[in-house]
């Protein structure tokens, strides 16, 4: 069995019981490849030390934040752009909305960076709440690896620890359903960006 881990970005739109919250986050994504040779013997690759993987991941996250900036539209959709000589911008690492939270996992303290672009006006979800969310996941090369353009329900206790820790930092918003079209619109929701190392 071979395990390859990489960090990714997730764009989230969070709606809790008709109230919404958007987040953009970096989510670990693990590819697991299992193969058996023709002689039916198996080989396994020993898992790497947790601290070594974390140190590599956090260095990659911090490098990304030092070399990219964000553009945010009126709906809190975020675009990441690499800083170059012809494309200047304020690095994410210098963004005034940048915060971090430290959690311990596997005996290693993990730094979870997040940008709080809008706090929201409603209630904060807890780690045990069910949330209604859409998202868009990016690899560190900015290619999209997963997306749910329409919101889906999931339990925060069933997702990665990073989501459980950062979702409660934001609040839900307000919603309005047009009785003629039955279309629900959301406003004043929490919105942000989250960066989560593997593990």
Could you tell me what each predicted segment is?
Residues 32-35:
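C-terminal motif of bacterial Sec signal peptides marking the signal peptidase cleavage site
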Residues 37-199:
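Cross-family detector of peptidyl-prolyl cis-trans isomerase
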Residues 25-30:
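Hydrophobic helical h-region of N-terminal Sec-dependent signal peptides
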Residues 2-3, 13:
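Polybasic, lysine-rich low-complexity intrinsically disordered segments
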Residues 10-24:
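Bacterial N-terminal signal peptides that target proteins for export
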């Amino acid at each position: 069995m071979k395990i390859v881990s990489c960090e990714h970005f997730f764009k989230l739109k969070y709606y809790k019981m008709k109230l919404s919250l958007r987040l953009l986050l970096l989510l670990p994504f693990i590819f697991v490849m299992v193969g058996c040779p023709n002689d039916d013997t198996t080989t396994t690759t020993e898992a790497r030390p947790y601290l070594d993987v974390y140190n590599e991941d956090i260095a990659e996250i911090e490098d990304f934040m030092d070399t990219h900036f964000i553009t945010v539209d009126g709906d809190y959709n975020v675009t990441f752009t690499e800083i170059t000589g012809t494309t200047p911008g304020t690095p994410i690492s210098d963004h005034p909305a940048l915060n971090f939270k430290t959690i311990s996992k596997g005996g290693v303290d993990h730094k979870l960076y997040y940008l709080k672009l809008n706090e929201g006006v409603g209630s904060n979800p807890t780690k045990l709440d069910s949330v209604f969310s859409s998202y868009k996941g990016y690899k560190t090369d900015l290619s999209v690896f997963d997306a749910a353009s329409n919101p889906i329900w999931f339990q925060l206790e069933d997702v990665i620890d990073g989501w459980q820790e950062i979702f409660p930092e934001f609040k839900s918003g307000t919603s309005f359903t047009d009785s003629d079209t039955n279309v629900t619109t959301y406003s004043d929701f929490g919105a942000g960006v989250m960066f989560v190392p593997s593990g």
